[in-house]
Amino acid sequence: MTRLKVAIVGGSGYAGGEFLRLALSHPMLEVTQVTSERNAGDPITFVHPNLRGRSSLKFRKMAELEPVDVLVLALPHGNAAKNFSEFEGLADTIIDLSADFRIKDLEQYKKYYGEDHPAPDLLSSFVYGNPELHRDELRGAKRIACAGCFATSVILALYPLLKLGVPYPKDIIATGLVGSSAAGASSSDASHHPERAGSFRVYQATGHRHTAEVNQELPGNFPIHLTAIASPSIRGILTTLQLWIPDGYSERDVWSAYREVYGDEPFIRIVKVRKGLHRYPDPKLLDGSNFCDIGFETDNESGRVVVMSAIDNLVKGTAGHALQCLNIAQGWEETLGLEFVGLHP
């Protein structure tokens, strides 16, 4: 059995480190190179102590990269697109974990990222990395733009309902509680422990960047408004979404939509239990896993539907999603290397 050789560019960050963790346990992958300009020469366990005993690799500089089968780019937004000529000849398959190649509309990219796209000619060569929506396009794909974490929690929650073609009478509101790891490994005033710990802080009331992905991927052109709140947790996103169904529709239709679209999905679980503590999705139960749990409650009197989605932002929201895409692209079992469940308690 020949394993594909993998290099991770930007492997000292949380996203790159999480892909590294998953890839080291994947039976079809062999991680041969991990880059970090700041930590070049240090063992990867210097930054990722959870990987002790799993690998003797050391970080290297990007200039030292050698050709591989799969190149994973885990760089700050903008870097992959601006420097893509340095990477494209290094691997047959390239997966980008940043936002650089997700958004196909150049005006939307400029609106939400504040600059013209640095490499617009490359956009059409990338498949948007959401397996539940783009499984067919991902088969055999050579370039994959992994979906954003908050966007994933919103898109997966709403897609079955918007696919129905129901004329929802009001705008859709999405509010996400986001763990601190979503901000990345670099420290800032906002991530300073005395400021972040125990705090629920709205950090993007309107104009969240992932709005562009949500609008691009969801059918129906419904107005969807995102608000992001920093939560005290380290991992996880819990998103609540509010929409109103028109007269003539009921909870039975909501159930039917989710069952029809997600009935056979390996990583989506519909959580709707009548009693007990765990009646709704909880991101704490998904730590380290590639699952997305979705639940809902319907107020028949007002027609309001509250949808809840939970993911681990570093796994289903980033690295696990990327590995799921790679499995599909290579024709492997989609769940390969991702079968594990979360932790409890």
Would you name each region that the model predicts?
Residues 141, 236-240, 304-306:
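Short, solvent-exposed beta-strand edge segments and adjacent coil->beta transition regions
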Residues 202-206, 229-232, 282-286:
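Short Gly/Pro-enriched turn/cap motifs at secondary-structure boundaries
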Residues 242-345:
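C-terminal active-site/capping subdomain that shapes the small-molecule cofactor and substrate pocket
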Residues 207-234, 238-240:
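Oxyanion-binding "anion nests"
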Residues 14, 125, 149-156, 205-212, ...:
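Conserved active-site and cofactor/substrate-binding residues in soluble primary-metabolism enzymes
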Residues 1-196, 201-205, 297-300, 338-345:
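N-terminal Rossmann-like NAD(P) cofactor-binding subdomain of oxidoreductases
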Residues 26, 221, 264-265:
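Acidic-histidine catalytic/liganding microenvironments
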Residues 18, 22, 156, 160, ...:
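Alpha-helical scaffold segments in soluble metabolic enzymes
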